[in-house]
Amino acid sequence: MFNPMTPPQVNSYSEPCCLRPLHSQGVPSMGTEGLSGLPFCHQANFMSGSQGYGAARETSSCTEGSLFPPPPPPRSSVKLTKKRALSISPLSDASLDLQTVIRTSPSSLVAFINSRCTSPGGSYGHLSIGTMSPSLGFPPQMSHQKGTSPPYGVQPCVPHDSTRGSMMLHPQSRGPRATCQLKSELDMMVGKCPEDPLEGDMSSPNSTGTQDHLLGMLDGREDLEREEKPEPESVYETDCRWDGCSQEFDSQEQLVHHINSEHIHGERKEFVCHWGGCSRELRPFKAQYMLVVHMRRHTGEKPHKCTFEGCRKSYSRLENLKTHLRSHTGEKPYMCEQEGCSKAFSNASDRAKHQNRTHSNEKPYVCKLPGCTKRYTDPSSLRKHVKTVHGPDAHVTKRHRGDGPLPRAQPLSTVEPKREREGGSGREESRLTVPESAMPQQSPGAQSSCSSDHSPAGSAANTDSGVEMAGNAGGSTEDLSSLDEGPCVSATGLSTLRRLENLRLDQLHQLRPIGSRGLKLPSLTHAGAPVSRRLGPPVSLDRRSSSSSSMSSAYTVSRRSSLASPFPPGTPPENGASSLPGLTPAQHYMLRARYASARGSGTPPTAAHSLDRMGGLSVPPWRSRTEYPGYNPNAGVTRRASDPARAADHPAPARVQRFKSLGCVHTPPSVATGRNFDPHHPTSVYSPQPPSITENVAMDTRGLQEEPEVGTSVMGNGLNPYMDFSSTDTLGYGGPEGTAAEPYEARGPGSLPLGPGPPTNYGPGHCAQQVSYPDPTPENWGEFPSHAGVYPSNKAPGAAYSQCPRLEHYGQVQVKPEQGCPVGSDSTGLAPCLNAHPSEGSPGPQPLFSHHPQLPQPQYPQSGPYPQPPHGYLSTEPRLGLNFNPSSSHSTGQLKAQLVCNYVQSQQELLWEGRNRGGLPNQELPYQSPKFLGGSQVSQSPAKTPAAAAAAYGSGFAPASANHKSGSYPAPSPCHETFTVGVNRPSHRPAAPPRLLPPLSPCYGPLKVGDTNPSCGHPEVGRLGAGPALYPPPEGQVCNALDSLDLDNTQLDFVAILDEAQGLSPPLSHEQGDSSKNTPSPSGPPNMAVGNMSVLLGSLPGETQFLNSSA
């Protein structure tokens, strides 16, 4: 971007924009094209430190119309290649001290830069303006390009006006306005004359240690201006101008010898300079050496030369040479005296400037010229200001420097905008201040030469350049005018532009008041809404995006943990009601428990005291792993948990589901957090360890009185993305009345019961009352829907299937083998009513997930007493914890074998236990005949050894009774046996200590169904199989002794399970972290009765062994 003040191109010559690598170019040709036809380079080519100063392509300027004599013959331009590249870029870290890097280098480029000033005349010490550099053979204005280098190795060239001379690049502002400031330095714009002497100023005007903190991009500028600027040839004097002396000499050395011997030493009484036009105006010096040094200003003598190889620097004062030598050695003996500041400087004057600018902001050096109110921190900046702004004719004296009483500078925040610009008589109309848009903005505290707007480091504004910039509260734009002046335009246009620019700077300064020097950052706020408000739509929490980034990545890394805790990494809110008003205290506890487990602490918060007093809604169990199809971690299904209710693709065949067919095991509806009551176990829904029974017992006993309200979404407010599954929808079948899947309701991970556990989340149309069903006699068989797979009881119509259970026996689980296996499994692998006749030809509804192939229904002989089995036996939809892989490719024979194993085990274990403690009335238990399973003969005597039984079904059902803790068991009884519900375990786990099963005796009797609820209270109990309705066998049908059993109220005593079977099963594997039941497992070796039913008999040999042993 060009300087907006640059006038349009007026010449016809233009060079097409080109890209030329700089490192292969060297110095531009100075041939017949002249110095005016060279294209200028884009600013970006000068911003890299990798090429160093030497790689900078220096463009030439027009020497036509120069007011000064032509330069001496140029020295070899090979010197450019000797310059050492900087190891850093101006874009480097804001706190980097570029001067330190330069000075500490053994072959510092500063020495080479300083060697430019070898001309003896017209120099104010080290400063000279506008003269040709004798070291490089380029006009003096080109020397300012030495501090830049191309970063990209290319040089985009643009048309260049040959009449304006060299287009000089202003170092890019690193503020928001990163524009390329192009400037043209013309010799006619720069006044040249011998510099005014400052004999009393013992500070080092040539000091190279100055840091330009304010102008971060101008970091080598002060060195360049102080030591590198070539002195004009006019300063090289050979004629004596002493009053009354007009001798002429052939060399400068002769002139110097003449002055020292004839004029200085000849007048020993007073030390006064009588040089014609001397600005001291005959003011005497205090010592003779001061006069000698002063005369070097007139003669241009620089006797002190740098001794480093390749360095041609020379100085008129010894202290300046010493300071320069520190640039080679890297010595910085002058440490900042401010406490906490570790900056070091090579000379005391630089340290004083730093301390004034950075720490105290004192500006004792005030320009005393009429109409100028500029103030500076050091005399060198004042001298530079006077020369560049007021012209070479302006005299800088002690009075101008402010050597008298030093006025205290106003604080930075109270500095009034001083906007008087070049309007004085001594100011040249050609002087143009650098526009603020091209100025680097004040760094918010960085104390580095590479400061920028965006640098957050540091705590104070930086004005080490001594330049008070408009809008930046320090320095002056005039100080940079000799380096940054605009292109050559007419005097009238230049004045207009200058006035406009000054007016603009004034306005900006007024609109942008100077604040405190420290960096003020806004207080950090959480991205998005508060945590309690982020729990919005399901997808919003599932994916790790910027909108939900408040959750710790420690527990959002898992792709399966789409329901990672909504709490921030800190402690979850104890007062949940304030943050999540839509939740009950129990629900808040549940969230806190999930959060504690997700963090891996393993210690959820203790249950809130309000749980004991709370009524209201039940919370769905959070232990489900496969409450929606396609999410079955053990089945190899690759899906993201954040995709709700997505049916899974066809994975590899998984293990056959080992559902037990022992009836629906009813656990009382849990209170909001009843599933994890033990504070020593993980409570996250995706915790590697399932909950223990101990955690659940206490809350189960409480939860019997808290039943969910009809149609209530328990976890409202979008807390659970998967709470919107209805029981029918998760099962994939219609409702009991033949309706389609119900709309989503409060269902979450675990809303379906785990294994033989009850679902505590009920959708519309479900109640919490214990329901009963009419006697399934042949008269009313047709009353039940064809897809109902569970016997209804004799006290209610079949429409009550959607009701939820209400149990009366606290702490125990009721078992009804006639209702199939526990609910919570995915449709189907459960055998509803194991002793019933399916409706012949009744196909049953197909699963809603049409892309899951349905296994063909085996056709059984219809002549037998037990016709075709329900379709539910062959369904492949997975369900909670049962890990029956959808799209399973197991054959029908394997499924039959599975059913045989399940039912035989359940019936044998039912007979093993003693009478129920509750003394429930005896009722006969339906039994599934082997004929129903396709003719498979099941031994009615458990002749198989315990080892065989253990090998057949892994951990199997371990009978346990609360009344028999010593390991002895009573004789089998045909009714209401209390036993523990075994859960399938991985086949690789060691077999638990077996318990012999008693023999079974034949019995005769009709089927009678008790008053229990269907299938653990799940509204889909009975239609899990989605197959035809099952009916009891004809009256008088001779069947196994199990037919006479009435397990209507057979219950599971969790206390007995907890006491006896605590250490019978090994820990779950990580992949099977969630139990198939909603009964928690202990933190140690999980209870055999609480294992994962999803992986029992994962190997086919185990099934075969059991079938062979039971045949």
From Swiss-Prot:
ZnF C2H2-type: positions: 238-263, 271-298, 304-328, 334-359, 365-390
Start-end of Low complexity biased regions: 546-562
Biased segments, Basic and acidic residues type: 416-431, 640-649
Region annotation Disordered: where it falls in the sequence: 52-78, 378-487, 528-583, 598-649, 673-692, 832-891, 1064-1093
Record-listed cross-link Glycyl lysine isopeptide (Lys-Gly) (interchain with G-Cter in SUMO2), residues: 1008
Key words, A-Z: Acetylation, Activator, Cytoplasm, Developmental protein, Differentiation, DNA-binding, Isopeptide bond, Metal-binding, Nucleus, Phosphoprotein, Proto-oncogene, Repeat, Transcription, Transcription regulation, Ubl conjugation, Zinc, Zinc-finger
Listed name of the protein: Zinc finger protein GLI1
Species whose genome carries this gene: Mus musculus
Gene: Gli1
